[in-house]
């Protein structure tokens, strides 16, 4: 027979953690005042009247730097457990970690040489 009673706490936590956000949205939708008007549609710029049109398109070049940051941040997350158990692990694991670090570095140097990190 299945031992589903072992997971009762999990199911209770899952149900409660699903019901709380739903209740929060429902209660705020019922209690919040609905006010529509020109002030609701205007952009707020630190209490100053906006100058010009707020719907301008412009190129954002930060995505490449954000992507590089995320890659190295994830790499740091994976290297932390390795660093904590460095004395127990052998030389082969050190070489594997070195390769793991070198792959994003080589990719970043390649992207830099190709001009992907240049402002244009």
Swiss-Prot record:
Subunit structure: NDH is composed of at least 16 different subunits, 5 of which are encoded in the nucleus.
GN (gene name): ndhC
Superkingdom of this protein's organism: Eukaryota
Function recorded in the entry: NDH shuttles electrons from NAD(P)H:plastoquinone, via FMN and iron-sulfur (Fe-S) centers, to quinones in the photosynthetic chain and possibly in a chloroplast respiratory chain. The immediate electron acceptor for the enzyme in this species is believed to be plastoquinone. Couples the redox reaction to proton translocation, and thus conserves the redox energy in a proton gradient.
A Gene Ontology cellular-component term: chloroplast thylakoid membrane
GO process annotations (BP): photosynthesis, light reaction
Top-rank EC class of the record's enzyme: translocase
Family stated for the protein in its record: Belongs to the complex I subunit 3 family.
EC number: 7.1.1.-
Membrane topology, record value: Multi-pass membrane protein
Gene Ontology MF, one: quinone binding
Protein name per UniProt: NAD(P)H-quinone oxidoreductase subunit 3, chloroplastic
Keywords assigned: Chloroplast, Membrane, NAD, NADP, Plastid, Plastoquinone, Quinone, Thylakoid, Translocase, Transmembrane, Transmembrane helix, Transport
Transmembrane spans: 9-29, 64-84, 88-108
């Amino acid at each position: 027979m299945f031992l589903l009673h072992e997971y009762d706490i999990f199911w209770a936590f899952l149900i409660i953690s699903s019901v709380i956000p739903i209740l929060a949205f429902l209660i705020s939708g019922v209690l919040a005042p609905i006010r529509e008007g020109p002030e609701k549609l205007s952009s707020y710029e630190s209490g100053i009247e906006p100058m010009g049109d707020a719907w301008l398109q412009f190129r954002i070049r930060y995505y490449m730097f954000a992507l590089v940051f995320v890659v190295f941040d994830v790499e740091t997350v994976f290297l932390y457990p390795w660093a904590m158990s460095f004395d127990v692990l052998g030389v082969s694991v050190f070489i594997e970690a070195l390769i793991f670090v070198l792959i994003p570095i080589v990719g970043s140097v390649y992207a830099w040489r190709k001009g992907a990190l240049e402002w244009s």
